[in-house]
Swiss-Prot record:
Residues 170-255 form the PPIase FKBP-type domain. Keywords: Cell cycle, Cell division, Chaperone, Cytoplasm, Isomerase, Rotamase. The gene is tig. The lineage of its organism: Bacteria, Bacillati, Mycoplasmatota, Mycoplasmoidales, Mycoplasmoidaceae. HAMAP family: Trigger_factor_Tig (MF_00303). PROSITE patterns: FKBP_PPIASE. Involved in protein export. Acts as a chaperone by maintaining the newly synthesized protein in an open conformation. Functions as a peptidyl-prolyl cis-trans isomerase. It comes from the Bacteria. Its EC number is 5.2.1.8. It is an enzyme of class 5 (isomerase). PANTHER family: TRIGGER FACTOR CHAPERONE AND PEPTIDYL-PROLYL CIS/TRANS ISOMERASE (PTHR30560), TRIGGER FACTOR-LIKE PROTEIN TIG, CHLOROPLASTIC (PTHR30560:SF3). It comes from Mycoplasma genitalium (strain ATCC 33530 / DSM 19775 / NCTC 10195 / G37). Consists of 3 domains; the N-terminus binds the ribosome, the middle domain has PPIase activity, while the C-terminus has intrinsic chaperone activity on its own. This is Trigger factor.
Length: 444
């Protein structure tokens, strides 16, 4: 027996409203059942608790409370079924999470509910094909991979003094330097006994290359310019003079990794590799994934900024904002649990109230929802779809990279667990493919 029927539906710019009538017999049976439950707590002189006649108990029960509890019961019973109604489930613009529920009629005889489902807004996309300064997606080069292997080898390195030589690329320069802007010493651009690896590009352009071939105790003045995107706004594009003294030159010496010693360089989680070849094969895949993920994240942030700045939505679905704000709060609470810190104590230490945090989360949720809606529309226009084969390949790749030594049985369990989050995995793949597509327009 169906517990309800849809009497009517109405669509506006922002919502789809379903008028739902609860089956009268079910509605009255729900009230009768609750009268019996509520009667157990009623006290009437001359009757033992729970032994009050139904007609007398019904007269003593708070009618408003009975209606409220009955309505909540039937809403819980029909909620998922209403979400699966054809008019809701078949419309991609309907957000079936968190509908607002109101009463049209509620009496002892019948109950009519109104389910308001938010709709995805209609909006104009900005020209996402012309976003500037995106980085092309490139494969891991042999030089990059060898550099990563060298970094591992350098964990067992020793520093030796080579102050009798001229400063070269790759050396560690021990320097005193003073930055001068507008004839004034700049404390934030000055230091003593600073260790600078030449070629690290950790200083502004021209600084490190300007020191090459210097000798110990030599002084040098560098006339440079802060970049236009320098992190200190007041210094962007400003001329700066650096007075530098080279105090010492050092170099890292290390033993190259080979088949006989490679395990001594590896972290504990990699100790099960039995050959350098097997480790390098895995490590190459790990570094390839890391490079691609880094480029994608950098591009994604630039794309996000462009889309948020240049997209105007007529409204944002409250259901999605609520869903995302709740997700952010749960994430913050789980992080506190991870560090075994009571959430209230973490809020106090951060000098923020729960209300202030929730307001901040709502602001972030609005940006996240806007970005997600715009990316979804781009994915639809570009006909980006993900089938089960792609989801399977993604899960298998994650397991291969994150759990290289898992047994076959454990891999099966991991696959099963991740497959239960199929929608989440699908959203990650679609976001990656959409980002990649936008980058392809920008870099060609």
């Amino acid at each position: 027996m169906k517990l309800y029927k849809v009497l009517n539906s109405k669509t506006t710019d922002k919502s789809l409203c379903l008028e739902v009538e609860i089956d009268p017999n079910y509605w009255q049976a729900t009230q009768k059942k609750l009268v019996g439950e509520m009667a157990k707590s009623i006290k009437i002189k001359g009757f033992r608790p729970g032994k009050i006649p139904p007609n007398l108990a019904s007269q003593s029960i708070n009618k408003a409370e009975l209606m409220q509890k009955s309505a909540q019961n039937v809403m819980n019973s029909i909620y998922e079924s209403v979400q699966q109604e054809e008019i809701v489930a078949s419309n991609d613009n309907v957000i079936d999470d968190y509908p607002t529920i109101d009463f049209k009629t509620i009496t002892e005889q019948n109950c009519v509910l109104l389910f308001y489902f938010d709709l995805i807004p209609n909006f104009q996309l900005p020209d996402y094909k012309k976003i500037k300064d995106l980085t092309p997606l490139t494969k891991l080069t042999e030089a990059e991979f060898n550099n990563e292997i060298e970094k591992l080898a350098k964990t067992k390195s020793t520093m030796v003094d080579v102050s009798d030589k001229k400063l070269a690329n790759g050396d560690i320069a021990i320097i005193d330097f003073t930055g001068i802007v507008d004839n004034k010493k700049l404390a934030s651009a000055s230091a003593q006994n600073y260790e600078l690896t030449i070629g690290s590009n950790s200083f502004i352009k021209g600084f490190e290359t300007g020191l090459i071939a210097m000798k110990v105790n030599q002084k040098k003045t560098l006339a440079l310019t802060f970049p236009s995107d320098y992190h200190v706004k007041e210094l962007q594009s400003k001329p700066v003079t650096f007075e530098v003294v080279l105090k010492a030159i050092k170099k890292l010496e290390f033993t190259p990794m080979d088949e006989t010693n490679f395990k001594s360089f590896l972290p504990e989680q990699f100790q099960s590799f039995t050959s350098l070849k097997a480790f390098k094969s895995y490590f190459h895949k790990l570094m390839e994934n890391k490079k691609q993920e880094t480029i994608l994240q950098e591009n994604n942030q630039k794309i996000r900024q462009f889309l948020l700045t240049n997209t105007k939505l007529p409204f944002l679905p409250e259901a999605l904002i609520k869903l995302e704000a709740n997700r952010l709060l749960k994430l913050q609470q789980s992080q506190a649990e991870q560090y075994k810190i009571p959430f209230e104590k973490l809020l106090s230490a951060s000098n923020i109230t729960l209300t202030e945090l929730q307001d901040r989360n709502i602001k972030e949720a609005k940006e996240n929802v806007t970005f997600a809606l715009v990316m979804k529309k781009i994915a639809d226009i570009e006909k980006i779809k993900v089938d089960n084969n792609k989801i399977k390949a993604e899960i298998e790749n994650v397991i291969a990279v994150e759990y290289p030594f898992a047994s076959d049985e454990m891999k099966k369990q991991l696959f099963f667990n991740m497959e239960q989050q199929k929608e989440f995995v699908e959203s990650i793949i679609i976001n990656r493919l959409t980002t990649t597509k936008i980058v392809s327009y920008s870099t060609h």
